[in-house]
Amino acid sequence: MKKAPRRTAERILGVTLELFNRFGEPNVSTTLISSELNISPGNLYYHFPAKDELVNALFTRYEDALNELLSAAPGVHDVEDAWFFMHTLFELVWQYRFLYRDLNDLLSKNRRLEAQIKDGLLHKTTAFRTVLDSLEHEGVLAITVSEREATATHMVVMLTWWLSYEYVRNPRHALEPESAQASLLRGAKHVLSLISPFAAGDNKAHLQALLAAY
């Protein structure tokens, strides 16, 4: 039995995400999207009357996935948990990499996204602070409250701008699918290395060994 075709709106969002990630949102027109889908511009307009609505719909999906992931922050109890949490975050960033690649451009023309991005930064900062609180409570880190505040902010900054850094380093290939694994590992490693100075006892050697493995 043939599978029922995905609803048109779902197909539109899937193809739009691929195109945005590949070419960057500013370089993708609704004409290109409808052509790639082999549907009429009118059909695309029926589902999403403006390109901003496509961006907002994709951001909502990203936000839902991000919120679910960040809700796991209280469960980070050791170095391995922290590595897995960080790597999973970077996988999500990669999946919606156009948001990070074109962040300044998107913010300059989409007021709704502007507010949502701000909320997202606060949510990430809170989640990272929760991770640091948990690791301090478990004795993995020896870190003060003020150090946790600063480190959580540094982690969010690095997570948010890592792909931009990768893109500047290698603009022709950094955001291509074949570069994903290496980029994600580098990003997760560098963010996690921010907690290394605070690692307590044997946890420092454990963390250094984990970072060296990647």
Residue ranges and their predicted role:
Residues 1-9:
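Short, Lys/Arg-enriched anionic-surface-contact patches
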Residues 2, 164-214:
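C-terminal peripheral helix-coil segments that are non-catalytic and often amphipathic
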Residues 60-66:
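Short, basic, alpha-helical segments at the C-terminal edge of helix-turn-helix-like DNA-binding modules
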Residues 71-98, 152:
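Hydrophobic alpha-helical connector segments
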Residues 112-138, 149-164, 182-194:
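Amphipathic alpha-helical packing segments from all-alpha helical-bundle domains
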